[in-house]
Amino acid sequence: MSFKDLRSFIDHLESQGELKRISHPVDPNLEMTEIADRVLRAKGPALLFENPVGNDMPVLANLFGTPKRVAMALGKEDPLALREVGELLAFLKEPEPPRGFKDAIAKIPMFKQALNMPPKTVRNPPCQQVVKTGEEVDLTKLPIQHCWPGDVAPLVTWGLTITKGPRQKRQNLGIYRQQLLGRDKLIMRWLDHRGGALDFKDFKEKHPGERYPVVVALGSDPVTILGAVTPVPDSMSEYAFAGLLRGERTDVCKAISCDLEVPATSEIILEGYIDPDEMAEEGPYGDHTGYYNETDSFPVFTVTHITHRKDAIYHSTYTGRPPDEPAMLGVALNEVFVPILRKQYPEIIDFYLPPEGCSYRMAVISIRKQYPGHAKRVMMGAWSFLRQFMYTKFIVVVDEDVNCRDWNDVIWAITTRMDPKRDTVMIENTPIDYLDFASPVAGLGSKMGMDATNKWEGETDREWGTPIVMDQAVKDKVDQIWADLGIDDAPTL
């Protein structure tokens, strides 16, 4: 099942008991965060606040608050099915010519999917049913959430920022938080390595002093939203990838004030520009780390047009100490990363980003070890292969007999198969998340790799331990007689 707009997905979630409408008045200032946080931690439904205090526009929260709902947004019922998305991405990143007739037949479905890539331009789009310009533009009339007591101002959190660089044919979609600065101004907090910031940098070099057109879409269809947070190849538009996932082309329309294309079924569109000479101090804000971050200077986004659907819905979220919505999104997208990594490193058995590690700061990888030093090669590969892992501070590599998603197994491997000096890799002066205040310098810090695999000849001179394993015949016999032993239900092993 695919969803052409946010509303059809909301209806589907409600029919499945995955969305709750809240008619009681709730304040976007702090109260929504507290309610959404409690519901998310209880693995509860998405929330539609129908009567936000001081506003008549409903607010949608916790949309992707469970891995199951992330899968549902992509037409899947099980998060594990998202590995199919990863297989598609792996193919797109490194397409291989068919190795023969049978292989060509097997690849036909992927080639057919590729035909659905280009977005489709539509007229009279829903997102432009209402158009506001000039004095009508007033961001303070949107129910923008003020998430935490120490936040400096309300924060736009789920906006898809649409940019285009002078050297790129494709448009870039990214999600960057935006601080409310005034009636028509937001602070665009994009880090230097993100697509929007790179497009802006290229534009400034080619057109010094000129205004840079930017559009922000709120409440787009769920597939396009998820396309913006998925590791799409740099040469490919997120619109095209969303079309692949949906099985049909993404509907877009031309923005009113510039040539950028926007998702046609979005709830709200903010159009405007960034003046390269206008910067503002952003923050502090509570973030996905569970702490308030430092302030810093970022570009100011001036909004010249607001367009929206009739009876528009405002899509929002909060970030805080895991679990939060980004952490749940990370759990689901974990399954997307596995096939991509396996294509480059076939020896990888599984890959896990623990949500309590802020989604990406720690990774555990199980491998089929084949030679001395193999674990270190995999560490280096994981750090460098995908941009998403450049901020991963800790990588633990374990053998295939260890479940990398079970901390009991992982801690056992670390404490029995590691010598701290021999098996720990420390790398200094590497890129680190700007929000990581534990690093000695903002944006620059160290990484640690831990080789918790069995050691081979050349890695140790000692006789290595043999794991204790019961004979299978004995286990089978005990299974047969268990009911006669008078013991409670057999434990699951």
UniProtKB/Swiss-Prot annotation:
Cofactor remark: Binds 1 prenylated FMN per subunit.
EC assignment: 4.1.1.98
Main function: Catalyzes the decarboxylation of 3-octaprenyl-4-hydroxy benzoate to 2-octaprenylphenol, an intermediate step in ubiquinone biosynthesis.
Coiled coil: none
Pathway annotation from the record: Cofactor biosynthesis; ubiquinone biosynthesis
Catalytic activity: a 4-hydroxy-3-(all-trans-polyprenyl)benzoate + H(+) = a 2-(all-trans-polyprenyl)phenol + CO2
Single Gene Ontology BP annotation: ubiquinone biosynthetic process
Protein name, per record: 3-octaprenyl-4-hydroxybenzoate carboxy-lyase
Keyword tags: Cell membrane, Decarboxylase, Flavoprotein, FMN, Lyase, Manganese, Membrane, Metal-binding, Ubiquinone biosynthesis
Gene this chain is encoded by: ubiD
GO cellular component: cytosol; plasma membrane
NCBIfam families for the chain: PRK10922.1 (NF008175), UbiD family decarboxylase (TIGR00148)
Annotated Mn(2+) binding sites: 172, 238
PANTHER family: 3-OCTAPRENYL-4-HYDROXYBENZOATE CARBOXY-LYASE-RELATED, FERULIC ACID DECARBOXYLASE 1
Membrane association type: Peripheral membrane protein
Catalytic residues, chain numbering: 287 (proton donor)
Entry-linked Pfam families: UbiD, UbiD_C, UbiD_N
Primary location recorded for the protein, binned into one broad class: membrane
Family per record: Belongs to the UbiD family.
Organism: Shewanella woodyi (strain ATCC 51908 / MS32)
Subunit-structure text: Homohexamer.
Residues that, per the record, bind prenylated FMN: 175-177, 189-191, 194-195
Enzyme class, first EC level, given as a word: lyase
Known cofactor(s): prenylated FMN; Mn(2+)
GO molecular function ontology, one term from the record: metal ion binding
Compartment(s) of residence: Cell membrane
Domain of life (superkingdom): Bacteria
